[in-house]
Amino acid sequence: MRGLAVLLLVACFCSVAFGDCENTECPRACPGEYEFDEDGCNTCLCKGCNDAQCRIYCPLGFTTDANGCESFCTCNTRETVCQNVVCSGKRVCNPRSGRCE
């Protein structure tokens, strides 16, 4: 039983010391940097953005400012759907959904 406790302690230490982050590929990129959590893992939020989430559904997503931050409860229109959206990798903003695909 004592060996199991030591093994668990070592496993926990390794997770904290060496980062046990999932291989996170964020669908959207940030014009600047991403925020990282207390373990050093990527949160997929742009640095300086508020992570408050609105409870309404926007078919075209939420408006986005020049820093890559989504507005709080302001839905996109057809005119604003892909403004200020930076997609990662080979993804592009889909004007029908406002999401990087």
UniProtKB/Swiss-Prot annotation:
List the protein's name. Answer: Therostasin
Which species is this UniProt entry from?
Theromyzon tessulatum (Duck leech)
GO terms for MF: serine-type endopeptidase inhibitor activity
- Name the protein family: Belongs to the protease inhibitor I15 (antistasin) family.
Task: Summarize tissue expression.
Answer: Salivary glands.
**PROSITE patterns in the cross-refs:** ANTISTASIN
Thylakoid: is it a keyword of this entry? no
Q: Does the keyword Nucleotide-binding apply?
A: no
- A Gene Ontology cellular-component term: extracellular region
**Pfam families listed in its UniProt record:** Antistasin (PF02822)
Checking SUPFAM superfamilies in the record gives: Leech antihemostatic proteins
Q: Where in the cell is it found?
A: Secreted
Keywords in alphabetical order, please: Protease inhibitor, Repeat, Secreted, Serine protease inhibitor, Signal
Q: What does this protein's UniProt record list under function?
A: Potent inhibitor of factor Xa. It also inhibits trypsin in a weaker manner.
A biological process term (GO) from this entry:
regulation of vasoconstriction
Q: Which interval of the chain is the signal sequence? A: 1-19
Please give the chief subcellular localization of this protein: secreted
Q: Which residues form the Antistasin-like domain?
A: 21-46, 49-75
